[in-house]
Amino acid sequence: MPHVAFDGWTQATFEIARKDVGLSEGDAQLACPRKELDLICAWSRQLDEEAGKVIIKADLLSMKIRERITFAVLERLKRVNRHEEAARRARARLLLPDAASDAPQLLWATADTIWRAVGDTSTDVNFYSKRAILSAVYGSTLSSWLNEDDTAKPDAHAFLDRRIQNVMDFEKTKGQLTRMTADLPDLEAMLGKIRHGAGL
């Protein structure tokens, strides 16, 4: 991490790290064929795992769902506190074209870790919508977190609160729409019948 903070996530710093831990070139290639990119991904997964363990041990039952998510997101964000510059450099590296698919995958993995840790058991479309929404919330809050010099992160906390409120408002509106349209014809079923040649 010290090398990354100064020189960024590059193949050169990967080679320095490899030599620091005494890993052969062959073993390093097997472990991280994409060198620094695979190292970033491994680091993110490690932070997910660390945060997940803390979240699971918390008294989640005493919290409302909004409080659980806020707590869980903050626990994950705190994992980068020791290496904020490395996290900034990782974010910059993930913006390059060869990492186009990595950033969204890592955000999704973080969101999945958080939802599972707080006890989410959804398996339907909600499984995907929850993770997609939380990925956006976490990603934007991480940017706010890393851009704030104050170690207490008051602006990032406030930003997270606003984002989660937006999500809660959306879910409330979605619930109202679901109730309003409950008695309408099932369009999906109708289309399915048409597709398979069944009459209405």
Model-identified regions with their sequence ranges:
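Short, amphipathic alpha-helix enriched in basic
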Residues: 1-26, 34-41, 45
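Hydrophobic alpha-helical connector segments
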Residues: 54-89
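Amphipathic alpha-helical packing segments from all-alpha helical-bundle domains
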Residues: 98-120, 130-135, 139
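Internal, conserved structured core segments that host functional sites
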Residues: 75-110
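C-terminal ligand-sensing/allosteric alpha-helical core of TetR-family HTH transcriptional regulators
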Residues: 65-79, 106, 110-117, 163
